[in-house]
Amino acid sequence: MTKSRDPVSKLHDAAVLWAVGYGSALDVVRAACDALVAGADGPSVAMLAGVSVRQADTELRNLLPAALDELGSPLYAENSEEAEVAALKVLASRALAGDLSSRELTDWAHRTFGHDRLPLAEPLAALDDQYDMLGYGPVGPSTAAVAALDTEVLTEARRILESAGSDRGGKD
């Protein structure tokens, strides 16, 4: 289901998800390796790609800003609202691509932002509540009910990607 994405976009996404604690430093280093192999050459990208597995957590903060700057990709402060919005857009994009289920997107948004921390994510938290409600009762949820809710989530994911202030935000 995934359409091929360029390695620089994948590095951006890995950096965004790391900035909100959803991805690991190693994910970023691996994405830098892929970008380097694909021709995104530069001394900072090469240094980031060369970080050892054991040193990824300690070296990333020092090397990532220059590497992203070389690639013309934005750097987000860890746990900033800008990073959270960008991460939400990355995961919304993955849901639309079929790489993340609608339920996984709503669950992450609800656990991460609740109902009032990030207004852009609130509709996903509400949809997560609806998924939870489908699970109650003596009979499991109907396939049609789940499919309808999945469709609502994907509509919301599109709205998130089209929202004002969209940087690259996970779009191809």
Model-derived features: where do they sit?
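Acidic, Ser/Pro/Thr-rich low-complexity regulatory regions
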Residues: 1-172
